[in-house]
Amino acid sequence: MASMKDIKRRKSSIQSTQQITKAMKLVSTVKLQKAKGRAEQTNPYFNYMYQTVSSMLAKSGNINHPYLKSGESTKKAVVVITSNRGLAGGYNSNIVKLITGSDLNKDDLLIYAIGNKGREALERRGYHIELEDSAMIESPSYEDASALCKKILKSFTDGEIGEIYLAYTHFKNTVSHEPKLIKLLPVEIEAGDVAEDTDSNVLMNYEPTTEEALDMIIPKYVTSLFYGALVEAVASENGARMQAMDSATGNAEEMLEDLTLLYNRARQGAITQELTEIIAGASAIS
């Protein structure tokens, strides 16, 4: 059995760690509420943008446009959104597993890493990191999202890449987050994604042309999805970290209870031993 001194040292160490996990949980809770509110404010716009593009493609007949077909290049850009810090449960590792477990050929991928954790993990696994940006995830802005999307879209229209994907964590609620890998370009709209109030039999004409309308709206569509993913990722990260720190705090409490019991047993044993020695000494004298 460990000595009382060793047990007290372990308890002190665990108590210090518990104070840290409690503080981190509190910070994550505050950040989560802020990020959650931001996501709730921006989601209606992004959903409307998606429905607009869905309706536009459904009502425009057959359109021959570069944004609607894969390029000749086999290269695929994948924007990977993770965090700069750990201690968030499986938040970062789930995104990495999503990439490594996908059908995408590693040799064809150009990784645009938003957040250090994803970059580090994929780099260790031999993926090519085309771009890294650790600052964007700390304070997402539509302007930064637009600047990166313009760069990737140019590579797409120039034929340097054939497809564009986005890997991020979808925020469902405080305790539920889902890693997702979606294709941004070429645009693929599922039939069920078109708003219910749209009549697919109605064709629309756009001025000056449908192709020129797509030239304007698709970049905004891609940027909107990307920015929305950034906002959801921040909320998911803080939700995951809050849960992880809550679990760590609870585990520390259980360990402290076990150590307290162990300490009391050791103390009781020491007292018993001392009494035994006193009684034995008294008996020897008498």
Which residue stretches match the model-derived regions?
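C-terminal beta-strand-loop-alpha-helix "lid" module of Rossmann-like NAD(P)-dependent dehydrogenases
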Residues: 1-286
